[in-house]
């Protein structure tokens, strides 16, 4: 199956759409309900992190792809412009929140902050 890619405006009200899309992908890959709930929570936490950095993003892009070792999920802030309007979210705290929810987590960052969250959910059954 091809990867699922969804791009939405980088606004808090669109996080629900990303959570629902991730839940749908989880159902397609027959992941257990507890994994589905962990993924939805991880998506929400990742969005919170990406929406509170030293930049303003125009869009958030969610990519989900099934692999042998599990469901790979990438959430990226796209079309970023610098702005220091608020205190950025702490990447270390975000990682601590995400680690118990997912099999693996990696945060991509540069001088303006975290711009991509890579996660792997456990393989089904």
Regions found by a protein language model. Name each.
Residues 1-4, 49-125:
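Conserved beta-strand-loop-beta-strand hairpin that lines the nucleotide-binding pocket
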Residues 1-41, 84-85:
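Bergerat-fold GHKL ATPase/HATPase_c domain
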Residues 32-56:
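Conserved ATP-binding N-box helix of the HATPase_c
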């Amino acid at each position: 199956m091809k990867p699922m890619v969804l791009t939405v405006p980088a606004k808090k009200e669109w996080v629900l759409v990303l959570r629902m899309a991730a839940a749908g992908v989880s159902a397609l890959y027959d992941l257990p309900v507890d994994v589905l709930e962990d993924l939805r929570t991880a998506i929400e936490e990742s969005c919170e992190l990406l929406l509170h950095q030293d930049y303003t993003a125009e869009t958030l892009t969610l990519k989900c792809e099934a692999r042998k070792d599990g469901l790979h999920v990438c959430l990226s802030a796209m079309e970023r412009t610098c702005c220091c309007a608020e205190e950025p979210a702490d990447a270390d705290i975000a990682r601590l929140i995400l680690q118990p929810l997912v099999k693996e987590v990696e945060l991509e960052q540069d001088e303006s902050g975290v711009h991509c969250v890579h996660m792997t959910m456990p393989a089904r059954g």
